[in-house]
């Protein structure tokens, strides 16, 4: 019979079990089936056991030899090595797959546990296995939630990517090192980790690996190293860019400066303030009163940093004595001023940035309120520009601060300078540090001396008054004695304080004898005969008569403080005057003027309104003809005045555009008047750029451009350098206080006289006025030296005085 042979079966033995295999006996079995004998199988004599006898047919070669050759070839083959090498990677992939499968479930459970109505989604009873398997929607939501949390953290801190990259990098190094350690029995774990790090940082290292599996691990590490370093480089670049952006914005940077000046806000006053501070620094360096070559100035605003840097670069070219720093931040936060080192500043200037007067005062109050929590602010002067004097008491009430409110009096200045020729030049002179300016100085060695002795004693200055208890008095009595705490107010060039003690003090001591009293009496009597005494109550600022001139005024433009302009015009003009406002602003927005008229604050002027564009030729022509025909039938000769004002929003946002519109309107008005043959007494306009105004006046001498914004800015800057001067300028710019006037010389002398400036000062004092200079031949001279020499003046010349609107004649013989 044909026999069927069952070949040898042998279990698979791993290489690690090879030694054990060699030590054990072989369990090879062979079974051959032959034809059975007729007698069948013989049973053994022992119960329960039997023997099977096998017989091989065919090949008689021993079976163990073939099996050994097969095993040796199998262990050395390439498939075997690949299978063995992939087993660890397969294990890692399975673990990662397990984690990936379990992660959505964990996220889902955590989210459901945090939701107050999570139980509502589990209303239908499900199989526990189905409950454990998350839906695809939950998986997507969980992944989106994880990505959202990561991006949120990334927005807060860009360094999150850097941390994640480092963790992933070291994880790959550890895993790769463990793989190397698995297949390198003769290498320590430390060397394997270092080898993995070398493959990560140097892509050429994986080429040095000997086995394919090690090369595969090195290749993976090299690829990840390239990805890691590219991402790391981009992250570091972005982090550096973000840091530089914060540095450029300056919002979170701490200023480490001292004795610097902080300016909050940007408007049309800023360039003039910088000009004044630059001039003051030049004189301080020249006099040796400062050790710093440049004055550090910090410009703070809520505008973007790029715009501020452009302004700073433009200003740096013109003001070489200033070192301008910029900081973009909120002006209503205490943290902003703390980072600006406000407690170490020399002064703080807060400028308005809004057109509405209420917004100006509100922003100013909030900025000052933000300074209140900062310590050591009692000695730091804070100069705040406000729209009205009503804010004085409110700002002064904030404890712990030295607040100096400065009222924005550009409207009053514009009217004053338009009514009095050369007054704008006098203001500029008194605010120019290279010329004569207001000074306040203590003289302890002169304590007890009478004010008359002080007036006549100083020959190099013009004594203007006394500052006592924070209040300035321009008209003390001659018998008033100087107290130790008083400060003398005078006009002189800017000098060191100690130099004033070296001035000549002639006539300081006057003997109070009968002869001297008689001499003084005779001098007063002689002077009173040569002057025109003031009335007991003046009704006009521009004239000593009982009523001002009657005029017709055409006001072109509109802004919120027009009411102040009308009030100032009302104090210069006489009864029966008229004022018409032409603007494209609706009548509903002009109710403030009507309310002032209704309350009786405007007495001499009748106000009317017209709606139209004052830059339109036909509209402006119609308004001028209407003003001309209004008094044509009357017998009186009514003078016509045309004034142009700038829009407040344009002054704050684009001053150059405001100047262009004002200049064009004034030139258009002059052209129309010339064509119609209308005689205009005064053509005046506001302007910010004084260079443009001078350029136009060279071509058109009949036009007047008044830089009231510049004067107000110079006042603010001067108060920042000496806060005590705020009371001086407050009184001068106040409509109800003392003001600077340019008065005809015929009020103080007779024709043919040649009095000295000292004599003119004494005659002005009899009129309760303070003479500070004169205008001779169109040239102004303030604080003339010497004062005792005769001055040849014509009757067309003028005397510059500081006077009150209502000054009673108190001089008695």
Curated annotation (Swiss-Prot):
TM region positions: 161-181, 216-236
Query: What Gene3D superfamilies does the record point to?
Result: NAD(P)-binding Rossmann-like Domain
Describe its membrane topology.
Answer: Multi-pass membrane protein
Q: Which residues form the RCK N-terminal domain?
A: 258-407, 550-712
Keyword field contains Transmembrane helix: yes
Q: Does the keyword Mitochondrion apply?
A: no
Pfam families according to UniProt: Castor_Poll_mid (PF06241)
Into which family does the record put it? Answer: Belongs to the castor/pollux (TC 1.A.1.23) family.
- Name under which the protein is recorded: Putative ion channel POLLUX-like 1
């Amino acid at each position: 019979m044909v026999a069927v042979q069952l070949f040898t079966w042998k279990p698979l033995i791993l290489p690690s079990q090879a030694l054990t295999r060699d030590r054990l006996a072989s369990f090879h079995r062979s079974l051959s089936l032959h034809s059975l004998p007729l007698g069948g199988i013989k049973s053994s004599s022992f119960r329960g056991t039997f023997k099977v006898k096998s017989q091989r047919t065919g090949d008689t070669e021993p079976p163990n030899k073939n099996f050994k050759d097969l095993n040796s070839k199998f262990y050395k083959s390439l498939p075997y090595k690949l299978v063995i090498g992939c087993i660890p990677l397969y294990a890692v992939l399975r673990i990662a797959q397990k984690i990936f499968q379990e992660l959505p479930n964990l996220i889902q459970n955590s989210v459901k546990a945090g939701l107050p109505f999570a139980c509502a989604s589990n209303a239908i009873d499900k199989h526990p296995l189905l409950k454990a398997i998350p839906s695809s929607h939950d998986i997507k939501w969980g992944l989106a939630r994880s990505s959202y949390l990561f991006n949120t953290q990334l927005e807060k801190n860009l360094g999150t990517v850097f941390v994640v990259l480092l963790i992933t990098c070291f994880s790959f190094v550890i895993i790769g090192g463990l793989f190397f350690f698995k297949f390198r029995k003769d290498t320590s774990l430390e060397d394997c980790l270092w080898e993995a790090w070398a493959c990560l940082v140097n892509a050429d290292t994986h080429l040095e690996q000997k086995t394919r599996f090690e090369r595969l691990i090195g290749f993976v590490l090299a690829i990840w190293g390239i990805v890691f370093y590219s991402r790391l480089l981009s992250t570091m670049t972005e982090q550096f860019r973000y840091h530089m952006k914060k540095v450029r914005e300056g919002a979170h940077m701490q200023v480490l400066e001292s004795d610097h000046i902080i300016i909050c806000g940007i408007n049309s006053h800023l360039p003039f303030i910088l000009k004044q501070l630059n001039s003051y620094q030049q004189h301080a360096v020249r006099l040796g009163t400062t050790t710093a070559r440049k004055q550090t100035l910090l410009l703070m605003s809520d505008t973007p940093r790029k715009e501020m840097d452009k302004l700073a670069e433009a200003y740096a070219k013109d003001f070489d004595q200033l070192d301008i720093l910029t900081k973009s931040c909120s002006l209503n936060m205490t943290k902003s001023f703390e980072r600006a080192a406000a407690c170490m500043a020399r002064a703080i200037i807060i400028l308005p940035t809004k057109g509405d007067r209420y917004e100006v005062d509100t922003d100013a109050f909030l900025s000052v309120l933000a300074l209140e929590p900062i310590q050591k602010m009692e000695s730091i002067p804070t100069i705040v520009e406000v729209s009205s004097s009503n804010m004085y008491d409110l700002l002064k009430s904030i404890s712990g601060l030295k607040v100096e409110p400065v009222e924005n009096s550009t409207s009053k200045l514009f009217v004053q300078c338009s009514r009095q020729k050369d007054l704008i030049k006098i203001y500029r002179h008194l605010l120019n540090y290279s010329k004569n300016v207001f000074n306040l100085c203590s003289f302890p060695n002169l304590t007890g001396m009478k004010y008359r002795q002080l007036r006549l004693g100083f020959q190099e200055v013009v004594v203007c008054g006394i500052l006592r208890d924070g209040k300035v008095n321009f008209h003390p009595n001659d018998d008033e004695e100087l107290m130790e705490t008083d400060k003398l107010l005078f006009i002189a060039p800017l000098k060191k304080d100690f130099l004033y003690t070296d001035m000549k003090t002639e006539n300081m001591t006057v003997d109070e004898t009968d002869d001297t009293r008689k001499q003084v009496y005779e001098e007063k009597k002689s002077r009173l005969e040569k002057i025109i005494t003031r009335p007991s109550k003046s009704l006009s600022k521009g004239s000593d008569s009982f009523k001002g001139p009657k005029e017709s005024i055409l006001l072109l433009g509109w802004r919120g403080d027009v009411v102040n302009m009308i009030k100032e015009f009302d104090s210069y003009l006489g009864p029966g005057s008229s004022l018409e406002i032409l603007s494209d602003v609706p009548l509903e927005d002009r109710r403030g003027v009507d309310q002032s008229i209704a309350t009786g604050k405007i007495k001499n002027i009748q106000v009317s309104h017209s709606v139209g564009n004052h830059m339109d030729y036909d509209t402006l022509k119609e308004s001028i003809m209407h003003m001309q025909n209004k008094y044509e039938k009357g017998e009186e000769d009514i003078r016509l005045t045309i004034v142009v004002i700038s829009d407040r929003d344009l002054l704050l946002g684009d001053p150059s555009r405001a100047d262009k519109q004002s200049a064009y309107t004034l030139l258009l008005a002059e052209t129309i008047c010339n064509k119609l043959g209308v005689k205009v007494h005064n053509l005046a306009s506001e302007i910010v750029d004084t260079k443009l105004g001078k350029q136009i006046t060279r071509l058109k001498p009949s036009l007047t451009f008044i830089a009231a914004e510049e004067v107000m800015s110079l006042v603010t800057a001067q108060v920042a350098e000496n806060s005590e001067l705020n009371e001086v300028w407050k009184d001068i710019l106040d409509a109800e206080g003392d003001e600077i006037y340019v008065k005809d010389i015929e009020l103080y002398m007779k024709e043919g006289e040649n009095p000295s400036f000292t004599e003119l000062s004494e005659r002005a004092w009899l009129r309760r006025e303070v003479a500070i200079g004169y205008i001779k031949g169109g040239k102004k001279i303030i604080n003339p030296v010497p004062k005792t020499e005769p001055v040849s003046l014509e009757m067309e010349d003028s005397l510059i005085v500081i006077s009150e609107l209502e000054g009673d004649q108190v001089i008695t013989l």
